[in-house]
Structure formats: C-alpha cells, structure tokens
C-alpha cells in the first residue's frame, strides 16, 4: 500500500473526505465532553513553516498534543527547503526522525517534492496553489450548521487564489455549485477551471454571484508575499467587498465564512464578522478538529502500510 499524503483535497476519495469530516465532528464532541483520547502517545509531528500562521501552528500543535503526541516547530530560520540542501535530501533526513510532517510554504512543488522522498505522511498546511486543510474546516462548519452541502450554491467573492482553487476541487468532490466573482485578471488559474469547469461559474461582479447563495466565502485581497501589490489590489477589488447588502442577495439562511485574518473595511465590511449568519469563529475552531481527524486518518493509514 502506497504512503498516503494530503497535498490537495484530491488525495482523498469523496468517501474518505466525508469520513474525515464526520470524524472531525466526533472528535469535537469528545473534546467538549472532556473525554481524553490519546491514540498517538510518542508520535511526533514536524511543522515546517516558511509562511507564518497563528491558526495553523496552534491547531496542529494543540491537535497532536491532545492525541498524546508532540510537535516540533521549524521556522524559516531553522530550515530553508531547497536553499542550502536539496528538498529531496531534507525530506529523507527529516522524515526519518518524525511520524508525520506538515509544511506551510510558497511553491506547491516544494510539498510535492518533499512528499515524494518522505518516509512518513506529509500534510500541506498551505501553498500558493492550495489550502486543503482550510477546506476541511469550512466543509465541517457548513455541515454542522446546515447539513449536507451537496446540491447547494457557494459564492466565492474575490481573488482566484489558493483558497479558491481548493473550493473548486471541493465543489467537484462534494457536489455543490461554485460561483466565483473576481476582477478581470484575478480569476482562478485556467488549469483548475479546465478540469472542473462543470461545477464552476465565473462572474465579473459580486452581486450576480451572491444571488441565491447558500454560503458566501471570501479572503484577503493581498495574500502573504503580495504586499507590494496592496494598493493595486485595493483598487481592483473595490467592488468585491462582502457586506450586509451583498448578503441580502443570498438565501436568508446563507452562511458567511472567512479563513482569517480578516481586514475590516477591505474584503469585508466593518461589521461583517458580527453578522447573524457569520460562522467564522466556529470555522476557525474547526481547523483543530478537522486536522485532528486528518492526522488520525493518515497515521492509521501509515500503520496499515507497515
């Protein structure tokens, strides 16, 4: 049996994805009832951060500790993948001392190359092209609040970035319609649209995408590494803010999500996080539970391989 990794949502079957989402909610209930569950005592998670993140570090580190394991944090100062030592060599050495690895970096090819030479499961904590762990949390959150997302309509408002790419994959796997509203020149990459165009519809304005939506999602206008484009992007995205007026075009029970951190007054209105249908705080917490379910799945699959 081949070693299992989680670099994109498509590394799972739809059945496996649904199983992980169900398990995430089970683990959440166990924690809320103060039930101690430590199946991975002695297991060590390596966390390689070339892009910093509060939520990613806390959720993974807390998750493996709650499982009875431990985590090692490696910052850009500790390891620079591909700079000084080939990624392939780093993967061989690092994975020989750990049980599972999470990488948050820039180029998606970095996690692919690392995984190719790793002896243990590798999780993509975020790359420029994909953010699959966030999709686990988003899907879990929607299901907890509204039930199955199959057949529903999701509106993505803003940049055709890594989050948007992962939503495109999720639409294909989970059977929902995805309406993407982006300024010209900021649409998702053609290769993602070419493969999953059957479940995606593009719009050049936010209002048309929001009509009858069951879920509206957005992200920052300028992601990490795009700070020099901030002013240019503010101008391009000025008409793509998610606010109360836009939510009024959607279904009355439409949920709102944002992976955070959010910039009030830019991609969202000043009060959007307090909207009655905003579930961003549940969404943020569910990173912990969804990633615990993912780690449990990957570690157990690796034990089967052994």
From Swiss-Prot:
InterPro entries to which the protein is assigned, alphabetical: Asp/Orn_carbamoyltranf_P-bd, Asp/Orn_carbamoylTrfase, Asp/Orn_carbamoylTrfase_sf, Asp_carbamoyltransf_Asp/Orn-bd, Orn/put_carbamltrans, OTCase_ArgI
Keyword flag Transport: no
Binding site for L-ornithine: 162, 219, 223-224
Pfam family, any one: OTCace
Entry superkingdom: Bacteria
Record localization: Cytoplasm
Family: Belongs to the aspartate/ornithine carbamoyltransferase superfamily. OTCase family.
Protein name: Ornithine carbamoyltransferase
